[in-house]
Curated annotation (Swiss-Prot):
Recorded topology in the membrane: Peripheral membrane protein
Gene3D superfamilies assigned to the protein according to its UniProt record, in alphabetical order: 2.40.10.170, Bovine Mitochondrial F1-atpase, Atp Synthase Beta Chain, Chain D, domain 3, P-loop containing nucleotide triphosphate hydrolases
Keyword tRNA-binding: no
Family: Belongs to the ATPase alpha/beta chains family.
Protein name per the record: ATP synthase subunit beta
């Protein structure tokens, strides 16, 4: 292993000079272990990742930890390979940082646990599966109107406090309980408090044993935030490739991955492109997203929370992410105000899988019927607000009545929210979801009160609730 010396430190970017002919490769991990001097200087231990070869036997690196206290002339060791992180069963129920070090104050991962490099090629064309398979979530509004596919990429849009985290927890819970699946959660540049809350809530809900968690939060240097998504993805890939599992990968928030790249880019000496983003934006995003896919062995399905800066969907960061998405789940604050949870907007959420070839004619027709009814109701709301319900034709009154029932029936109780609501959660199979909405559209339940449809699972529960209300 070759040894170099630090010649320049610019914030999170460090230049290192190596002896002639001993340059480390791009993406190699270098370690610095600076012993504190006698005058009270602290020990500094930091990992660097090679980003550029500058010539003159010098490399430019990005630090994965704080460079405070680092001095020029300090010795740097080339590890001979990329950052590698623990994978496999040992990671479940644990919390790691970008380097695969445990940060949950529990026992260290067992010696001899397999470690995989975080940089690797995406699966080749031959390895990819050619069939599109639907991932049943048990959440009615998702399964009916914007179904997720195995190995797909789903964008989760929503402001603060509309239920992104609860929806993520419920998906982790349902996949673990109904499909025996494994989840990996990557916290990228978000609040440490939220990560801490999520960990404890998942512990209480009993789903932590099926989940590995990786965090590089807001307070971390940009290098860590830029690479932590790859650490989580590497852990997920092991379960897909070695165990043939269907894995859920949650990334919260994918925008911070781009943001961290842009923070480092200028310091690396690259010319900024549009809106000050890095010129390599599309490449970096592609390298991450192309590894998230279904192979013949298993699948990695990713659900990515996406922050949209200033609600500008044309901003290069969200616009680049959109190109990779198969489905979007849009959370709407207006629905939370009406007490409809999950607050998924049934008209704004989309999925490529919602086509007769993939979901079948019946599912497609029911979903489109539901959307038509809700769209008509939305158009009639202005008239109702000005003139009142009495001015509507009989046909329109019927549409409004059914639309309200549909809107309420799209809500349901979640297992992970049982401790707040006191109501048992419900998992609704797709077939029952389709049948329920088909019957509502056909007018089978026009005589039941609207409130009977609120926060229930199957359509039979509506009938039961209506009897109790009578």
């Amino acid at each position: 292993m070759s040894t170099g010396r630090i010649i320049q430190i610019t914030g999170p970017v460090v230049d290192v000079k190596f002896p002639s002919g001993q340059l480390p490769e791009i993406n190699n991990a270098l370690t610095v272990n600076q012993q504190g001097a006698a005058d009270g200087a602290v020990d500094v231990k930091v990992t660097l990742e090679v980003a550029l070869h500058l010539g003159n036997d010098t490399v430019r690196t990005v630090a994965m930890g704080s460079t405070d206290g680092l001095m020029r002339g300090t010795e740097v060791l080339d590890t001979g390979g990329p950052i590698s992180v623990p994978v496999g069963e040992a990671t479940l129920g644990r919390v790691f940082n970008v380097l695969g070090e445990e940060i949950d104050l529990q026992e260290p991962v067992a010696e001899g646990t397999r470690r995989d490099p975080i940089h690797r090629e995406a699966p080749s064309f031959e390895e990819l599966t050619t069939t599109t398979e639907i991932l049943e979530t048990g959440i009615k509004v998702v399964d009916l109107l914007a179904p997720y596919t195995k190995g797909g990429k789903i964008g989760l849009f929503g402001g603060a406090g509309v239920g992104k985290t609860v929806l993520i927890q419920e998906l982790i819970n349902n996949v673990a309980l109904e499909h025996g699946g494994i989840s990996v959660f990557a916290g990228v540049g978000e609040r440490t408090r939220e990560g801490n809350d999520l960990y404890h809530e998942m512990k209480d809900a009993g789903v932590i044993t099926k989940t590995a968690m990786v965090f590089g939060q807001m307070n971390e240097p940009p290098g860590a935030r830029m690479r932590v998504a790859l650490t989580g993805l590497t852990m997920a890939e092991y379960f897909r490739d070695e165990q043939g599992a269907d894995v859920l990968l949650f990334i919260d928030n994918i925008f911070r991955f781009t943001q961290a790249g842009s923070e480092v880019s200028a310091l690396l000496g690259r010319m900024p492109s549009a809106v000050g983003y890095q010129p390599t934006l599309a490449t970096e995003m592609g390298q991450l997203q192309e590894r998230i896919t279904s192979t013949k062995k298993g699948s990695v399905t990713s659900i990515q929370a996406i922050y949209v800066p200033a609600d500008d969907y044309t901003d290069p960061a969200p616009a680049t992410t959109f190109a990779h998405l198969d489905a979007t789940t849009n959370l709407e604050r207006k629905l939370t105000e009406q007490g409809i949870y999950p607050a998924v907007d049934p008209l704004a959420s989309t999925s490529r899988a919602l086509s007769p070839e993939i979901v079948g004619e019946e599912h497609y027709n029911v979903a489109r019927g539901v959307q038509q009814t809700l769209q008509k109701y939305r158009e009639l709301q202005d008239i109702i607000a000005i003139l009142g319900m009495e001015e509507l034709s009989e046909e329109d009154k019927l549409i409004v009545a059914r639309a309200r029932r549909i809107q309420f029936f799209l809500s349901q109780n979640f297992h992970v929210a049982e401790q707040f609501t006191g109501q048992p959660g419900s998992y609704v199979p797709v077939k029952e979801t389709i049948q329920g909405f088909k019957d509502i559209l056909a007018g089978k339940y026009d005589d039941l009160p609207e409130d009977a449809f609120r926060l229930v699972g199957r359509i039979e529960e509506v009938v039961e609730k209506a009897k109790q209300m009578a």
